[in-house]
């Protein structure tokens, strides 16, 4: 287990950037090393980059599920790691640590067991990514969430607004927005909200 100073020291410091942004880059470098060589389970389908602050497009959602159930692929990533993935929306520059969108987007992913059943509602796990409310995004936990989904759960993995661009309690509010969204759309998303779990670090 590395301590914070070790992680910061291994990052590429830029004197022109504020300390908190350098820390974001340092944590990102550490997490990238952690995830090297991971092999994703092949019995999971992923629907990525929905937006929990926008009304859902039910037709597009049904098309995504049908596409994945037929084991076809859509999107640019077609390696075995991403063979059952559907990009509901493109993320723009949401993965750029220096961008405003990285700190202020409301995208989320859902992971399902590989053989979705239109008549089944799955027990649901919501994953709140770590990072002290100022760093991190859903991609950091994609492998972990896929592993949970491979055990028979629907797993929701999401972004929330980060500090310091967004003042407290913005991140907490986004957790509430996400939960309300999946509750209101549980039927379409095949989620059993009577079997609802949350986790995070």
Regions found by a protein language model. Give the residues of each.
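Residues at the C-terminal ends
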Residues: 8-27, 75, 79, 150, ...
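N-terminal cap/lid segment of alpha/beta-hydrolase-fold proteins
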Residues: 21-120
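Short beta-to-alpha linker loops that shape the active-site pocket of alpha/beta-hydrolase fold enzymes
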Residues: 114, 131, 154, 159-163
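Short beta-strand element of the alpha/beta-hydrolase
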Residues: 119-132
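Gly/Ser-rich "nucleophile elbow"/oxyanion-hole loop immediately N-terminal to the catalytic nucleophile
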Residues: 120, 183-199
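Short N-terminal helix/helix-N-cap motif within the alpha/beta-hydrolase-1
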Residues: 135-139, 165-166
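Short amphipathic alpha-helix adjacent to the substrate-entry channel of hydrolases
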Residues: 139-157
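Alpha/beta-hydrolase active-site loop
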Residues: 166-188
């Amino acid at each position: 287990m590395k301590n914070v100073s070790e992680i910061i020291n291994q990052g590429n410091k830029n004197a022109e950037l504020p300390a908190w942004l350098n820390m974001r880059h340092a944590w990102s470098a550490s997490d990238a090393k952690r995830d090297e060589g991971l092999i994703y389970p092949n019995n999971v389908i992923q629907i990525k980059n929905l937006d929990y602050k926008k009304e859902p497009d039910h037709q597009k959602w049904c098309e995504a599920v049908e596409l994945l159930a037929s084991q076809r692929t859509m999107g640019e990533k077609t390696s075995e790691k991403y063979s059952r993935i559907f990009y509901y929306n493109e993320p723009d520059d949401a993965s750029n640590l220096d961008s405003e969108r990285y700190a202020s987007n409301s995208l989320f992913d859902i992971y399902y067991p590989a053989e979705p059943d239109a008549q089944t509602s799955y027990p649901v796990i919501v994953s709140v990514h770590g990072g002290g409310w100022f760093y991190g995004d859903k991609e950091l936990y994609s492998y972990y969430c896929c592993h949970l989904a491979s055990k028979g759960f629907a797993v929701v993995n999401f972004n929330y607004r980060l500090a310091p661009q967004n003042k407290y309690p913005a991140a907490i509010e986004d957790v509430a927005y996400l939960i309300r969204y999946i509750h209101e759309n549980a039927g379409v998303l095949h989620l059993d909200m009577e079997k609802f779990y949350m986790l995070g670090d």
